[in-house]
A protein has these predicted regions:
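Conserved beta-strand elements of beta-rich interaction domains across eukaryotes
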Residues: 44-45, 63-66, 97-100, 122-125, ...
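Beta-strand elements of modular eukaryotic interaction domains
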Residues: 44-51, 81-84, 93-94, 103-110, ...
């Protein structure tokens, strides 16, 4: 891996369980522990759970360096109405651009701006279809 590519990752490559646990701890500390129920584990595990539970899957890509991330997390993700609606109707997986799995997924999804949310319909344990995607400045709450 080139030194430039290594420099965009702030932590060593870890396993997805550790990455998501670290992200949740980061989110709890920086924003609030009042947020949707973030799934732990890999993105693939989140897809499997969503398929098994017949739920849509929201994937949030977090860029700690993006100017709109703090406002989005504080005003949208941590809002009571978003939390209640999301927990009742979806499963929610989040990843940081500083983690390899989330970064790789963002490339596959052609993420061009942040904040970035994708809603997936999980058609099997390995197949998903994008139901909707939201990127850039997202207003509400």
């Amino acid at each position: 891996m080139s030194s430039w590519l290594q420099s965009i990752f702030t932590s060593p490559i870890l396993n997805p369980d550790t990455d998501t646990t670290n992200f949740i701890n980061y989110f709890d500390t920086k924003y609030s522990n009042e947020h949707p129920n973030f799934l732990t584990g890999s993105y693939q595990l989140a897809v499997e759970k969503a398929f098994q539970q017949s739920k849509l899957l929201i994937v949030y890509m977090h860029s700690p360096l993006h100017v709109d991330s703090d406002e989005f997390c504080n005003k949208i993700i941590c809002s009571a109405s978003f939390i209640e609606y999301t927990n009742s109707n979806f499963l929610f997986w989040a990843g940081s651009m500083s983690d390899m799995e989330a970064y790789s997924l963002s490339i596959q999804l052609k993420t061009t701006s942040f904040p970035f949310l994708t809603v997936f319909m999980c058609q099997s344990k390995n197949a998903v279809q994008i139901a909707d995607r939201f990127n850039g400045t997202i207003t509400g709450a």
